[in-house]
Amino acid sequence: WVLALPGQWIAGVGVLVRSITMATEPVVDAGSGMNPETFTAAVAKLDPHGRRFTSLVPAQLARLLGDPRSLVALQSFDRILVGGQAAGRELIAAARAAGVSVTTTYGGTETAGGVVWDGVPIGDTSAAMVDGRIHLRGSSLADGYLDDAERGAVAFPTLDDGLRWYRTDDAGRFADDGRLVVTGRLDDTIVSGGIKLDLLEVAAVLRGMPEAGDVAVVAIDDARWGQAPAAVVTGTVDEASARDALVAALGPAASGLRVVHAGSVPRTPTGKVDRVAVAALFG
């Protein structure tokens, strides 16, 4: 296994545990932030005759696919687990078309990592939908949160079936073939001016504007609208143009849009958008 994620994160712990279970020594990508050069160097240290595995977040996968050296390294793996954030269908399709064996995973710290692979619960995991919210159950569930019984009671309710479940913050549905489809975070839906607005749709519209560049959207409190979408962009699009495009596509709920320009979108060490840092840009 190649450890390309922080070892203190549940996905990183998963890599270490799996490596130990397989009686192998993990190779640690010790670069200052994972990049194609350090990843390729780490892969070169693997046993050339052994099976190869790693876990990545989508942002890492996208970056590695774009470099010829790391693409060859990716192609050498038997399986690459991709999780930690929503992986777009286009990214997964591009990876598979390039000969990279990827498996999408879904879960969290509360489930000891990914427990749904390519939409199918693994082991004794079960998935259920309650009012559009994904719930997960299985032997890997956490007992609760340290010194926070109240939070644990909310996150791990006993449902009508008498069983204990983990109540996620994600919306989803089951596809016709029974696979679980994660459609977004429930906190990605806000009420702005009395109208519901999906921040994922806001981001999608902005990303469709070539002059927007990289985009991240969060919700901020607004005296007029209650809540408003706030976007950090790396391109040159101005706030008025972005607002006009959003209102045309999504309606008046997008009228409160705020935009700030930045050299890059703030991200966590694993490549997720740092929502707290993005919101801080708006004071």
Residue ranges and their predicted role:
Residues 2-63, 103:
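AMP-binding/adenylate-forming
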Residues 66-119:
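Gly/Ser/Thr-rich phosphate-binding loop
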Residues 121, 130-158, 197:
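Conserved ATP/PPi-binding loop(s) of AMP-dependent carboxylate-activating enzymes
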Residues 127-129, 153-156, 170-174, 217:
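A structural signal for short hydrophobic beta-strand segments in well-ordered beta-sheet cores
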Residues 138, 163-164, 171-254:
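AMP-binding/adenylate-forming catalytic core of the ANL superfamily
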Residues 251-273:
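AMP-binding/adenylate-forming catalytic domain of the ANL superfamily
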Residues 273-283:
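Phosphopantetheine-dependent thiolation modules in NRPS/PKS and related acyl-activating systems
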